[in-house]
């Protein structure tokens, strides 16, 4: 039976970020997606100018209540949340997750804790604090990048070993799995892009090429979370889902770099989202 994921993220009319980077890849992999947009912007915020705004937080809950009213909420297998437009939306996500799990106790919640960083992503005050304080106790899985992981544990991280320790501290607060979408390891080659996935008993490290963009494309993290969620819903083991994610994201990023584009080449690389031609084996990053 086809799996269904409720994806609560931003939407851009032009380009690929948030749901605009996540929905198509998940569908291409064979997962039904119910997009719930937290904001609707003309384009992503790293252009420096954009129009649009956030959806009302109460309307988010009302929309999910509407799905429940037609008897479809028990079909939801997972909730994926990403960029939130207001602190009130973060509270609405908690209500939505509670409603989904009440309708389907087997459903799980994957939190991509978008906090904003030096990269230019604009996040409203109060959202980071909510994500750090509350979401680890609610999420079944979390997908921070390096900076977000540091904020979640309250200290700097410089090595793989320190990252695994930080992930395990986070796991002790609630989530069963932590996917580090981008890990900065001082011991890794400068031309490699590192990722890490950690559970209570497993830790897998993976690398792909780091492409020399003049401007790094936006939406790579959203794509990463989406592919990992989809492959997990399709029944992959943690390692298999991780390796497929690493390979599929590499295919999209490589196609974007080769085309000289700023926006992700999702359509051009769609066949490799499903069946990547290049594969990158993960290795054990640590054992509990």
Curated annotation (Swiss-Prot):
Provenance organism: Paraburkholderia xenovorans (strain LB400)
InterPro entries on file: PM/HMP-P_kinase-1, PyrdxlKinase, Pyridoxal_kinase_PdxY, Ribokinase-like
Matches recorded under Pfam families: Phos_pyr_kin
Known cofactor(s): Mg(2+)
Presence of keyword Transit peptide: no
Residues the entry annotates as binding substrate: 10, 45-46, 222
Subunit and interaction comment: Homodimer.
The protein's role, per its UniProt record: Pyridoxal kinase involved in the salvage pathway of pyridoxal 5'-phosphate (PLP). Catalyzes the phosphorylation of pyridoxal to PLP.
Name of encoding gene: pdxY
Protein name in the entry: Pyridoxal kinase PdxY
């Amino acid at each position: 039976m086809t799996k269904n994921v409720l994806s609560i993220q931003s939407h851009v009319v032009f380009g690929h970020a948030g749901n605009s980077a996540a929905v198509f890849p998940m569908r291409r992999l064979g997962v039904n997606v119910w997009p719930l947009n937290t904001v609707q912007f003309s384009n992503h915020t790293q252009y420096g100018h954009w129009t649009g705004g956030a959806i009302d937080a109460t309307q988010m809950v009302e929309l999910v209540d509407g799905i429940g009213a037609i008897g479809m909420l028990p079909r939801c297998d997972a909730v994926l949340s990403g960029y939130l437009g207001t602190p009130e939306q973060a509270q609405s996500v908690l209500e939505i997750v509670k409603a989904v799990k009440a309708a389907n106790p087997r459903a799980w919640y994957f939190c991509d804790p978008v906090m904003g960083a030096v990269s230019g992503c604009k996040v409203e005050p109060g959202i980071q604090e909510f994500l750090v304080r509350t979401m680890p106790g609610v999420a079944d899985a979390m997908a921070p990048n390096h900076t977000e992981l540091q904020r979640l544990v309250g200290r700097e991280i410089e090595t793989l070993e320190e990252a695994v320790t930080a992930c395990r501290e986070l796991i002790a607060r609630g989530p069963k799995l932590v996917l580090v979408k981008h890990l900065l390891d001082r011991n890794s080659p400068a031309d490699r892009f590192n990722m890490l996935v950690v559970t209570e008993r497993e830790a897998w490290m993976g690398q792909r090429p780091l492409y020399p963009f003049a401007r790094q494309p936006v939406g790579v993290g959203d794509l990463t979370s989406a592919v990992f969620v989809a492959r997990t819903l399709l029944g992959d083991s943690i390692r298999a889902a991780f390796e497929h994610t690493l390979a599929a994201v590499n295919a999209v990023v490589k196609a974007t770099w080769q085309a000289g584009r700023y926006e992700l080449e999702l359509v051009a690389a769609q066949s490799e989202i499903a069946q990547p031609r290049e594969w990158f084996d993960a290795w054990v990053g640590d054992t509990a």
